[in-house]
């Protein structure tokens, strides 16, 4: 399990040197490539799949509900999501006991569900990863990642 987490962290720790307006596109591109790369472990590919689904959902809902929103908003949310997931795996890898890991999982899940961005009523879609034991990234798609990340960072 620890090896898997370390591999996931390494895959997620891709350096982003893109300019601010390219963050969303860069994370999406790298995540799509990782999700399709059969040489990567299934767990790494599942994390990348979550990122792709989340980024596509975010863009779709932003266009639908906030047509005047800027590319910068998508970049900011995408970067915060990337940081949130990296911090999640970092803290999981640091946890020694199963109870600590369960507490970390609960804190991150709660931060994602308690910080809704779009207030989407399509719960089947929004919660498609939330209680799905097949994925480590059991987070709501309808998340304000900036707020969720701030919540997690404020509670160590």
Could you tell me what each predicted segment is?
Residues 19-69:
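Immediate post-signal-peptide N-terminus of mature secreted/exported proteins
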Residues 3-4, 26, 33, 98-102, ...:
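N-terminal cationic leader/targeting segments used for protein routing and processing
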Residues 1-23:
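Bacterial Sec-dependent N-terminal signal peptides
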Residues 11-13, 37, 62, 116, ...:
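Generic secretory/membrane-interface signal
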Residues 73-156:
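Surface-exposed, polar helix/loop patches in the mature regions of secreted/periplasmic/lumenal proteins
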Residues 15-17, 52, 154:
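Short intrinsically disordered, low-complexity segments
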């Amino acid at each position: 399990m620890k090896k898997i987490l370390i591999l996931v962290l390494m895959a997620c720790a891709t350096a982003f040197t893109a300019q601010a307006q390219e963050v969303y596109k860069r994370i999406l591109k790298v995540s799509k490539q990782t999700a399709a790369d059969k040489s990567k472990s299934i767990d790494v590919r599942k994390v990348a799949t979550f990122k792709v689904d989340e980024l596509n959902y975010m863009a779709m809902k932003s266009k639908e509900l906030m047509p005047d929103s800027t590319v910068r908003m998508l970049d900011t949310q995408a970067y915060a999501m990337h940081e949130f997931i990296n911090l999640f795996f970092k803290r999981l890898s640091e946890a020694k006991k199963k109870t600590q890991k369960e507490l970390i999982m609960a804190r991150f899940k709660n931060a994602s569900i308690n910080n809704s961005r779009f207030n989407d009523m399509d719960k089947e879609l929004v919660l498609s990863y939330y209680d799905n034991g097949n994925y480590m990234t059991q987070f709501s798609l309808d998340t304000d990642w900036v707020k969720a990340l701030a919540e997690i960072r404020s509670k160590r």
